[in-house]
Amino acid sequence: MAVDASRPFPLIRNKTLNIAALLSKKNTKSEKQELDFATVQVPGVLPRLVQIPSEEENAKCFILLEQIIEKNIDKLFLNYEVLCAYPYRIMRNADLTIDEDEAEDLLKEIQKQLKMRQWGEVIRLEVESGIDKRLLRFLKDELKVAEEDIFCIQGPIDLTFLMKMYGLPGCDHLRYKPYTPQKNPKIEPGENIFELIRKGDIFLHHPYQTFDPVVDFIRQAASDPDVLAIKQTLYRVSGNSPIIASLAQAAENGKQVSVLVELKARFDEENNIVWAKKLEQAGCHVIYGLVGLKTHSKITLVVRKEEDEIRRYVHLGTGNYNDSTAKLYTDMGMFTSKTRYGEDATAVFNMLSGYSEPLVWNKLSLAPLWLRGKFLSLIEREKEHAKNGRPARIIAKMNSLCDPGIIEALYDALSLIHISEPTRLRC
């Protein structure tokens, strides 16, 4: 695509790979060389990794699609000399600007905002190291990118193509040996999950232990004639989710099914809209989330009629109800039928689906109202133990730590207590 007075700089889609080129018309008599700019999108429908013959026996040789285009780019611009060509990629601001207080229909508003995401502000420009300065200046001006948001990449841009190589035949040496998750010693496949939970709480550690009991918990609840209701929060689920299928089946079987599908789950908004509609069509009561907040908790409540009582079964987890990522991500979960957990789980869903704000909790703490205070009191408790000569230690595992109050409290406790804190992202 050429760029000049009549052909404006095109919309470059987020994270697509493109090639920028500087051109000069051949056989011009002008003393001053006039430069033209063009951009070529690397086709996303073609394999980026192209295998070519190798001179060495049993060796595999590959070339990238953008390298093929670069070597032959002159064929796209007849009667023009290609002075230089370099690949580049942009990233756009993916935040959705939603005025939830004014939005009459959150689902429709998010759908509208998703269409506008492709026009988001460019927040990162990646270029190949050694790019021609004239070409870089042109890209910077047209894309309106700040100097600090330009990244010169040594080697190929966007390394996700390496996953394709990982899966190719003959590349076994690039792969770890497959890991088979262990069964939880308290759970035998095919057994009644509710009977097992009644015997005692069950702790799960994924991916070292299989996620199957969680999937089976929802599946059995959907078909169990004694189950009256299922309530669940969903943030991210797999592409062909057995949990979604079980929830839909439960509603079709006449059970009361309430599901909070978080429509504002970053980069899963479109998927979650699809799942929300599917669950609604099956007869589930679907909640789209709370105004001004993201519901990130992972909790399931199953209400079951047993002899002369109603018993509540609860699953709590640190990870998504996603049977695919549960094979990779380190998370913990717990099944329980203890009354106090059941009462708290009921209170959570009453908050999510209605107008309710409990003042007292038995076991659970929720952000943003109570969780920070709970952690601060636990840190203070360990400090008091240390001051009084009792054993004191803090072990905290988290994705990220960015709350100023918690950070300050941990620093304050560090002089008294040994703190182990594996943090996945940032601190």
What would you call each of these model-derived segments?
Residues 1-228, 244-246, 412-416:
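N-terminal non-catalytic structural scaffold regions of very large proteins
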Residues 6, 176-182, 187-188, 344-398, ...:
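Flexible, glycine-rich loop/tail regions that form catalytic "lids" or insertion modules at the edges
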Residues 261-329:
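Phosphate/diphosphate-binding loops
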